Amino acid sequence: MDDLRDTLMAYGCIAIRAGDFNGLNDFLEQECGTRLHVAWPERCFIQLRSRSALGPFVGKMGTVCSQGAYVCCQEYLHPFGFVEGPGFMRYQLIVLIGQRGGIYCYDDLRDCIYELAPTMKDFLRHGFRHCDHFHTMRDYQRPMVQYDDYWNAVMLYRGDVESLSAEVTKRGYASYSIDDPFDECPDTHFAFWTHNTEVMKFKETSFSVVRAGGSIQTMELMIRTVPRITCYHQLLGALGHEVPERKEFLVRQYVLVDTFGVVYGYDPAMDAVYRLAEDVVMFTCVMGKKGHRNHRFSGRREAIVRLEKTPTCQHPKKTPDPMIMFDEDDDDELSLPRNVMTHEEAESRLYDAITENLMHCVKLVTTDSPLATHLWPQELQALCDSPALSLCTDDVEGVRQKLRARTGSLHHFELSYRFHDEDPETYMGFLWDIPSCDRCVRRRRFKVCDVGRRHIIPGAANGMPPLTPPHAYMNN
């Protein structure tokens, strides 16, 4: 649809039928083939399709839409079209709406779902910015930092981690302001690493379970990350906030690159490793957003072997009125100039982001969410030891006992501290090993994670509510 009003009306018709899937399908049959503009990217469209006109996805519809395995709240979903644009195959990205109005995208190639927005109104603002796949494609990449010779040199090496590390060592410290148009990244700066504390001292927050208010040594950082990454990797830099007057960089997450060129973040407040980007170029486009709020949902094994952060639930407790998408109260919000934060405001924002993540993980465990099984044992132990646990719950001891009940023996992880290398499957071997394939690394990660877990599957994770009309069509 070329007319903006007609496009908005079409989105509105979809939104108001979120609770009536049969009515929604009737509308889609009438509008089948219609192309709707999206907020981002500009050259992409959603081609509306009914549930019987989605090609190979029809055979997967029951699993994806009705079994609740792909989203945190086991929400019923309904497809309403596929993404059409440069670089995409037909039916590769299927767009769905949840029974409570959330907008999702199923990636057929990667067998995962991205939660694009909690409401249709938010989707009209953000488009597909929360779908990682777009940020891996050159046509849609928009960096959040200003490229210079340093970045260009680093991006040339891709999977050559040794040369990349040598380049960072040679050039030394450099910081870059993060320009996030939607203000979703809690960090204000990214900085390349340096050991020279006279140039800049990397300092952790008081929430850190590693070095509260201090600085971690590079080798200790590697020792903590290698049981998760399980292959050769190097330190690239850090995300957080730079305070030039004090020559300090307040770290929210350290940034590492493995031998395959994948970028990870190490969170010292959670003793956790999160996948940030598929490569350095994608990292410049998303920075620390995936290490703050991850929108990718997938099965437990896939989430663990990819080191995906547990996704943040955006579902409102009460289904919002779909008609709010026509409100104009904040349409000009994004056009206003953003205020430059003071150091105090920037530091407070980092602490708020860290606290939010801690509270999110505690809630997963206390509510027996299926996503709690995605947490690594080190994360559970870090929650037990966290100085911020009292901010997350009133029953600190009760929560601590529940966290410990989920944590198995950490002896398997302690091998890395003792530097035992008699067994090729120890972490000292992982640190220097350059495996021949990604499959070996994935196998190691899943094995290592489950060794340290206890009571992997909570009671609530095994069952799903029975299918009831209008969802019965999924079995047909």
UniProtKB/Swiss-Prot annotation:
Keyword Calcium tagged: no
Quote a single Gene Ontology cellular component term. viral tegument
Pfam families given for it? US22
What UniProt keywords apply to this chain's record, in alphabetical order?
A: Host-virus interaction, Inhibition of host caspases by virus, Modulation of host cell apoptosis by virus
Biological process (GO) annotations held by this record are:
symbiont-mediated suppression of host apoptosis
Family membership noted in the UniProt record? Belongs to the herpesviridae US22 family.
Assembly behavior:
Interacts with host pro-caspase-8/CASP8; this interaction inhibits CASP8 activation.
The protein's job, in short, is: Plays a role in the inhibition of apoptosis by interacting with the pro-domain of pro-caspase-8/CASP8 and thus preventing its activation.
- Protein's name according to its UniProt entry: Viral inhibitor of caspase-8-induced apoptosis
**What organism does this protein naturally occur in?**
Human cytomegalovirus (strain Merlin)
What lineage does the source organism belong to? Viruses, Duplodnaviria, Heunggongvirae, Peploviricota, Herviviricetes
